[in-house]
């Protein structure tokens, strides 16, 4: 029995690969990404003494990317809304004011800790999340996590079940483009995901008092684009999975990095550079930027152009890949359908002369 199970495991290469790859993946993630301490933050210094004050900041922690003596506090708030920097220090007043982006929870905690050691020379003001509530940061990210679950796991399982029941074979004989079939298949899941998004957003506001400071249209547009990406990913997973179990395994393998490396749990700024770049390849990373930006900071579409552009590119790539794979799945059934149709037509054509000959023979006998 033991030998038989080992043989079965050796034949199931996908499960074997998961057993080997998953521990390695978890080791890398928790070794290089499981870090809540942000060691460097982007800072801007504005106001009349901007240049002089910037020189006094500890360079090991503050990466001063902007020094503008002519800017004021209004400009500082706009820079934080655009997430150009994590903190803007406004000089020309006593004490000096530091506006901190509270939507970046762990970075803002580190900034406040460092500035509190200045001996009262700097007064801190936390914007967008004044009490540094974890729920305010997590709820916008959880919306994306739920959409990811629906798009990858639920969609892939639903489509694989159709293959197991033979429904896809019926689609193969229909004159429908693969892209049209995919759009028809993902439409119900798109609707379910949209309803869940509305429910979670509403409950987040009612239960946790999470603000919604931005434009609703920008938020809905970002959610729709992200949902399109993860639904395409779910279709792609279904095309490389033969059974429901394989679909669940593959979808979970795709979901785990998105949970841990998207910045939802561990801050991207605290990750090792190599692991951080993996995070930048994940769709949930960019939806989290959009949802937190719109809900907490009131960010505009113009300031969120990068995550929107990346999600658009991902949607094109993922949907194209899913269409190509889906076309390959339908191709054998369509070839079989055309192959059986041609002999039937030839038999009908052959039956015509035979029937005519039989009729003429009957006429001569009469």
Predicted regions and their residues:
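Transmembrane helix-loop junction
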Residues: 157, 161, 174, 205-206, ...
């Amino acid at each position: 029995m033991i030998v038989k199970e080992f043989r079965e495991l050796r034949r199931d290469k996908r499960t074997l690969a998961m057993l080997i790859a998953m521990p390695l993946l978890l080791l890398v993630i928790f070794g290089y990404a499981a870090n809540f301490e942000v060691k460097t933050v982007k800072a801007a210094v504005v106001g009349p003494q901007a240049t002089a004050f910037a020189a006094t900041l500890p360079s090991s922690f503050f990466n001063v990317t902007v020094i503008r003596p002519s800017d004021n506090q209004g400009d500082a708030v706009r820079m934080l809304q655009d997430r150009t920097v994590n903190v803007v220090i406004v000089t020309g007043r006593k004490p000096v004011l530091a506006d901190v982006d509270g939507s970046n929870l762990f970075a803002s905690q580190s900034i406040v800790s460092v500035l509190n050691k200045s001996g009262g020379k700097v007064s801190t003001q936390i914007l967008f999340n004044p009490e540094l509530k974890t729920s305010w940061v997590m709820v916008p990210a959880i919306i994306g996590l739920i959409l990811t679950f629906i798009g990858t796991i639920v969609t892939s399982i639903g489509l694989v079940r159709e293959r197991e029941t033979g429904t896809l074979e019926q689609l193969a004989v229909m004159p429908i483009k693969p892209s049209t079939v995919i759009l028809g298949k993902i439409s119900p899941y798109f609707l379910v995901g949209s309803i869940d998004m509305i429910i979670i957003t509403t409950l987040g506001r009612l239960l946790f008092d999470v603000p919604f400071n931005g434009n609703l249209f920008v938020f809905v547009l970002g959610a729709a684009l992200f949902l399109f990406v993860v639904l395409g990913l779910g279709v792609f997973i279904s095309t490389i999975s033969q059974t429901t179990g394989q679909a669940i395994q593959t979808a979970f393998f795709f979901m785990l990095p998105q949970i841990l490396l998207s910045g939802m749990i561990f801050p991207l700024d605290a990750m090792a550079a190599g692991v951080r770049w993996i995070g930048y390849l994940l769709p949930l990373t960019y939806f989290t930027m959009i949802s937190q930006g719109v809900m907490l900071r009131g960010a505009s579409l113009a300031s969120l152009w990068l995550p929107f552009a990346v999600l658009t590119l991902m949607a094109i790539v993922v949907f194209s890949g899913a269409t190509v794979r889906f076309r390959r799945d339908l191709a054998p059934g369509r070839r079989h359908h055309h192959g059986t149709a041609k002999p039937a037509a030839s038999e009908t054509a052959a039956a015509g002369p035979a029937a005519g000959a039989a009729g003429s023979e009957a006429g001569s006998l009469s």
